[in-house]
Swiss-Prot record:
InterPro entries: KsgA/Erm, rRNA_Ade_diMease-like_C, rRNA_Ade_Mease_Trfase_CS, rRNA_Ade_methylase_Trfase_N, rRNA_adenine_dimethylase, SAM-dependent_MTases_sf
Name of this protein: Ribosomal RNA small subunit methyltransferase A
EC number: 2.1.1.182
Catalytic reaction equation(s): adenosine(1518)/adenosine(1519) in 16S rRNA + 4 S-adenosyl-L-methionine = N(6)-dimethyladenosine(1518)/N(6)-dimethyladenosine(1519) in 16S rRNA + 4 S-adenosyl-L-homocysteine + 4 H(+)
Organism: Wigglesworthia glossinidia brevipalpis
Gene: rsmA
Amino acid sequence: MHKPIKKLGQNFLKDKKIIKKIINFINPKYKDKIIEIGPGLGALTIPISKISKSITAIEIDKNLVYFLNKNKNIKNNLNIINIDIMKLNLKKFFSSFCDPVRIFGSLPYNISVSLMFNFIENYNKIIDMHFVIQKEVAQRILARPNNKHYGYISVIMQYYFYVEKLIDISNCAFKPIPKVQSSLIRMRPHKVCPFPFCDIDKMKVLLKSAFNQRRKMLKNSLKKYFSVEQIILYKINPKLRAENLSIENYCNLSNNMIIKK
């Protein structure tokens, strides 16, 4: 049996009830083009490969690639790419698929946020994503205004995706047992963005300024870009803090900000 590698964040799903629930939430179909991030020992890979016509798995650990390729329970419709997902040219990778894809995986906690940000650049090639991630990260992604977890990642992810939590998962569902709890989330790209169009690069600058000083009032945290009078002009109370603004508020502000070079 494969010994988990700690530096790769390997914690393998073992709870059969949880595995079944996850597969039911993903609800794979025969014609789906499916991508799995980090198949591990194949807890999800094996049952989904029996349903879907095509599944591409990305796995950094060459020993797991060997294990999966030799597994007699996996059909020959599985294509495994042995590479670090963080080093994969995603634009080139997604362009190899004629149709939009579905993505799932139990993400290593140390790369989950960075990886999801990388997917944003190709969100128009994605049907949906189902990820098992650290519960704390899920809370940050899902958080709404006036919530202590609401921040940069909440605004950016919700600008591009409809996000929802499906279930919480006990750490006992994994082997070895991690120190943190997990959640299964679903992310679907907006077919029509519910927020005003905005210059996303400007919004990122604005969000970093606001949330890096989240306990400060907006009149102080955003003073580099807006006067108090300007903030009021956009129908925002300058005494509010970063966590009090809606995504629409941030869109409107970013569309009117001037970044001095």
